[in-house]
């Protein structure tokens, strides 16, 4: 064990040139030789998003290996593109800083995860930069073409259905399982739910299929406008952000919270569903006819409430304001 | 003084939402409300570049205030776009991490510098992300359209002239002046040179005008191909990178090193010219006719040597290999 650690290559031994040389295999030929990457003309509107992921703030080696970290970084970004009407992923750039004592195998693992996600969801590794830094930090910028659908948080209208593309709270449960949190032992969590939860935490899927189905379901005569965001900061935060940007009230039906089939009942489990975060599902506000078509076409979607005129907030159908219960407010400062 | 420090707002007091709220003034309306930024269709090839800048590796508060840091981050990126044939800057995204104890005024200053550079060189602030982190880190991704010129490091050909768009070593001298390095006191540095050097260090200019002139000078019958890179990692490194990518030898004329008119003589000063770095000038390999036209059209350019067949290295015209002399190898690990 000691021997292995001693002979492990670290970034300091390699230096910047050799690191870039080794990253060549993940790039298209020639891109690493120039100062920029070239992107062919798409003749379409583009959407762009940047996410900054910092060790011990956004990820931890206890619960996610380097492969997962790379995969999640891409999935997080593509989830943002999806809820903005993505048509085709063009690619990503990667800024990476890490202490010079970091093993090369860590960087290699992160890039392997990045490449695996790009292979699955499309897009190229367009280049990037690496630097020495005290804390492992990944900054990913993703670029894609925008399809015909205009998805903005501000497009919600009173009368709309509020729909999610899938169950919530799984990633948070996965985290607790990976940390052997006592709460996951106090209750009998079915094995299938455990599997789904850990996968949701380590290898989340951006809601690209859900978006494609949403497009196909649009009733012919309706304009190409809808309100959407993703639930990366939790379901409740997603709903509230639609309310804030569209200046209306969301009325959520407590018995229709989007839960996994095997989800246990209890306050903690409800809180995780509403505020667990890192769910990467679409949260969409849609006119009724379109909503019904999407619900029918995609069984994992769930109608959780309606939008109505009123102050920008989320309330239960009994009229009570939905209060945030968890400490985790995704306040990254 | 103590009172002022106590009442200074820090990021922890504001939280992520309030920070984003305050950054709104730097963005186009509405972009901060959505998960991504929308970019209109350009119907052209695009070029993209990402730079990761870490405090105490790439910048220091001793020599650069927050305004300078923001400006330099943009200039660094646009310099890379320029040496890849930039036509129009579309915009940038900014990933920023900083300790939660960082004063808001620091972030505000960085964004002020970023915006000033975009106002000068074009392009919008397209969005970004911010996070808590142990070390101040900026990750900027710049996107632009590519003009007709195909500038690649691999396009140098034997017989080409090697030309730089301006003098080298100024930024390194500026750094030494700002640090009160004894070497800058042992010699009488003219005031004008001091001014230019400090400005080159704190407020560098990407070589966009030089590129535009290069385009205008292209002889009619010649193909739109040339070799270029920028000298952000030093003049010698830029020359060597052209040699490596084009697999030929650069022969540099010692008496034609690109120096400021008032540049002192001596080994240290030659070393700074060749390896000081952060010069952000174009280093171009051009067929003779095109080279002569550019030299004539732009007085600050300088022909420093020729390319010839041979191994991928830089040598003096007396046949000696140019040796790296400085410790600063821009090895950021």
Curated annotation (Swiss-Prot), chains A, B:
Mg(2+) 4 binds at residues 35, 80. Mg(2+) 2 binds at residues 51, 80. One of its GO terms (molecular function) is ATP binding. This is Thiamine-monophosphate kinase. Pfam families: AIRS, AIRS_C. Pathway: Cofactor biosynthesis; thiamine diphosphate biosynthesis; thiamine diphosphate from thiamine phosphate: step 1/1. One of its GO terms (biological process) is thiamine biosynthetic process. The lineage of its organism: Bacteria, Bacillati, Cyanobacteriota, Cyanophyceae, Synechococcales. Catalyzes the ATP-dependent phosphorylation of thiamine-monophosphate (TMP) to form thiamine-pyrophosphate (TPP), the active form of vitamin B1. Substrate binds at residues 58, 278, 330. The keyword ATP-binding applies. Its EC number is 2.7.4.16. Reaction mechanism of ThiL seems to utilize a direct, inline transfer of the gamma-phosphate of ATP to TMP rather than a phosphorylated enzyme intermediate.
């Amino acid at each position: 064990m000691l021997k292995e650690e001693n002979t492990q290559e670290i970034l300091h031994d390699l230096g910047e040139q050799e690191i870039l040389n080794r990253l060549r295999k993940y790039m298209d030929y020639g891109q690493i030789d120039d100062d920029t990457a070239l992107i062919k003309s798409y003749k379409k509107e583009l959407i762009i998003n940047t996410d900054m992921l910092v060790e011990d703030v956004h990820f931890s080696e206890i619960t996610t290996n380097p492969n997962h970290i790379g995969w999640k970084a891409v999935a997080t970004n593509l989830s943002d593109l999806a809820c903005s009407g993505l048509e085709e992923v063009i690619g990503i750039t990667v800024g990476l800083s890490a202490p010079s004592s970091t093993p090369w195998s860590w960087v290699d693992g992160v890039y392997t995860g990045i490449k695996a996600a790009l292979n699955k969801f499309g897009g190229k590794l367009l280049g990037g930069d690496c630097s020495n830094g005290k804390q492992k930090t990944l900054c990913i910028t993703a670029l894609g073409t925008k399809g015909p659908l205009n998805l903005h948080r501000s497009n919600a209208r009173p009368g709309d259905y509020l729909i999610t593309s899938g169950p919530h709270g799984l990633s948070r449960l996965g985290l607790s399982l990976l940390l052997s949190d006592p709460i996951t032992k106090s209750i009998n969590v079915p094995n299938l739910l455990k599997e789904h939860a850990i996968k949701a935490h380590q290898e989340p899927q951006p809601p690209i299929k859900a978006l494609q189905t949403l497009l196909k379901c649009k009733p012919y005569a309706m304009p190409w406008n809808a309100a959407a965001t993703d639930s990366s900061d939790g379901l409740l935060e997603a709903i509230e952000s639609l309310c804030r940007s569209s200046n209306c009230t969301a009325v959520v039906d407590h018995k229709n919270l989007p839960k996994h089939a095997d989800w246990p009942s209890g306050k903690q489990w409800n809180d995780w569903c509403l505020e667990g975060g890192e769910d990467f599902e679409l949260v969409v506000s849609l006119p009724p006819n379109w909503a019904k078509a999407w619900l029918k076409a995609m069984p994992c979607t769930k109608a959780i409430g309606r939008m109505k005129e009123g102050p920008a907030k989320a309330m239960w159908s009994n009229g009570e304001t939905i209060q945030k219960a968890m400490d985790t407010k995704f306040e990254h400062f």
